[in-house]
Amino acid sequence: MASVRAAVGASLAVARTRPRCVGLALPSSAPRSAWAAAMEPTPRWLAGLRFDNRALRELPVETPPPGPEDSLATPRPVPGACFSRARPAPLRRPRLVALSEPALALLGLEASEEAEVEAEAALFFSGNALLPGTEPAAHCYCGHQFGQFAGQLGDGAAMYLGEVCTAAGERWELQLKGAGPTPFSRQADGRKVLRSSIREFLCSEAMFHLGIPTTRAGACVTSESTVMRDVFYDGNPKYEKCTVVLRIAPTFIRFGSFEIFKPPDEHTGRAGPSVGRDDIRVQLLDYVISSFYPEIQAAHTCDTDNIQRNAAFFREVTQRTARMVAEWQCVGFCHGVLNTDNMSIVGLTIDYGPFGFLDRYDPDHICNASDNAGRYTYSKQPQVCKWNLQKLAEALEPELPLALAEAILKEEFDTEFQRHYLQKMRKKLGLIRVEKEEDGTLVAKLLETMHLTGADFTNTFCVLSSFPADLSDSAEFLSRLTSQCASLEELRLAFRPQMDPRQLSMMLMLAQSNPQLFALIGTQANVTKELERVEHQSRLEQLSPSDLQRKNRDHWEAWLQEYRDRLDKEKEGVGDTAAWQAERVRVMRANNPKYVLRNYIAQKAIEAAENGDFSEVRRVLKLLESPYHSEEEATGPEAVARSTEEQSSYSNRPPLWAAELCVTUSS
């Protein structure tokens, strides 16, 4: 269990948001319905979990509507409450897909592949049985989706189970995602399917081991129950298996939790369900700050009002969010659905849907095929997060004056993002001794070179980790570096026109004949981008593979010379250059992951799981627990062979067919 202990230690360094279970109270004594009081199977492996459901004690919970038990899930507005009671809907023959040992270790659990453990996990983590002390509920929140206020949203497919207090003094909220309908399910069924659940399960854990603040995933349980899904929204629905993910975090409260008080929006006309309930906003703020920002609460106990406390809270949320998105940019992570309801109030990556990691570097990469306007491209993520913080600032008024919040946002976000981003990029480039003003320009030119050559984001940084600081083997290194650039076939596929030529021609004619109408339609950006694609495609058609290779080498030789010049400045005054080089390489390898959850890796695991084979999910999970591991660390012929196999299977550039993979909001 050494790896588990190490993971627990690492988690303490990454998640700064963990509230302590000080003065542990008995589980909530709130009245429980007949179904909650009914006899449940007795857990054995999970028997030691102690629940203390503070959120339900300290925040308003909706009084269940009169009627039968199944009326708990009747879709309805939920005014004057932060939670509604819920009940997981049973699944037919639940079966464990995988457990995450490091995530479950947070709860004091030792995971294993013993049949009894897997059976118990499948029973309780599917929602088919409830652990003693759990109080299932659904959280009420609103959100701005793709820039427009959508009104009440809430946990339509997720359920709060309760909060586990551990022997280490930590408190963790447990949540089942995909456990069935709630009052917030609207017209949906409250279920998630196998493909989307595997993606969330694997990416939650992958992000943690990359060192990025994130919610965790302890288990993935599938079943023989099915639901209909139209994966690509093309009129071809199919049945898919219902699956549940056990999610773990200090809290799942989000920016949108504070938007339930929003008056009717001037654009959409929608309002939050608790307009005018300033008392609940105060209650929610008090709960969040005292529970998850206790140092801020303690620093402002003598204040005559809470404005300075709330300002300090907003400042910290702003800084955490800036650092989080900076970390995303440094590993090429694209979230895909950065709505305000998908932004954690404690600065964690939350709600993994149509996410993706960059393969070929493209600043305009759209990982979510449902994002037709490209609102959430890779390069726009920092500014979208800042926009979401602006909406949080508006939601906190009058408890925090908007002018003060906006001043904090203007002062903190861009500065903190740039500081953290450049600090991380310096480590990725092995610039460990001195900081130079031109480092930002060097990074920008690196990304420009990667874009011009279609370089693989993850693998390019890995190759740079072995860059010779002297002039030895420079030709061999350049060959290895350019081998990570996209082939001519890949580029032609990537830049193929996406708009029917006749439609494009009509749009161009409209732009000439009636520019006002063309502007009103709002397709100018799309047409401009399509023209750029057509032009790029035309240039590619005139290139030969050897021409492309020569251009790539020229681009990289130019940047590598600047990089070498910067390294020369880095080692000025160094006495032991060998020790400096060794430390530089060590830092680079510790900050440039070899393995990320590429879409094609996830897809292969999903396809195997859909055929009843969960071994690939478990294999990928173990691989992602050591993303910075390199084959140089392997010892012995068997270990080296295994490492080499993993290298070729999981760290190569994606196959050509991976470019056709399409991920949407369908889940």
Curated annotation (Swiss-Prot):
Keywords attached to this entry: ATP-binding, Magnesium, Metal-binding, Mitochondrion, Nucleotide-binding, Nucleotidyltransferase, Phosphoprotein, Selenocysteine, Transferase, Transit peptide
Entry binding sites for Mg(2+): 342, 351
Ligand binding (ATP): 154, 156, 177, 189-190, 247, 254, 351
Residues the record lists as Phosphoserine modifications: 651
Renumbered residue ranges of the record's region Disordered: 628-652
InterPro entries: SelO (IPR003846)
Keyword Protein biosynthesis tagged: no
Gene Ontology cellular component list: chromosome; mitochondrion
Transit peptide feature range: 1-6
Active site, UniProt feature: 341
Subcellular location: Mitochondrion
Modified positions (Phosphothreonine) in chain numbering: 635
EC code: 2.7.7.-, 2.7.7.108
Catalytic reaction(s) noted: L-tyrosyl-[protein] + ATP = O-(5'-adenylyl)-L-tyrosyl-[protein] + diphosphate; L-threonyl-[protein] + ATP = 3-O-(5'-adenylyl)-L-threonyl-[protein] + diphosphate; L-seryl-[protein] + ATP = 3-O-(5'-adenylyl)-L-seryl-[protein] + diphosphate
Molecular function in Gene Ontology: AMPylase activity; ATP binding; metal ion binding
Span of the signal peptide: none
Family: Belongs to the SELO family.
Function comment: Catalyzes the transfer of adenosine 5'-monophosphate (AMP) to Ser, Thr and Tyr residues of target proteins (AMPylation). May be a redox-active mitochondrial selenoprotein which interacts with a redox target protein.
Name listed for the protein in its UniProt record: Protein adenylyltransferase SelO, mitochondrial
Organism: Mus musculus
Record lineage: Eukaryota, Metazoa, Chordata, Craniata, Vertebrata
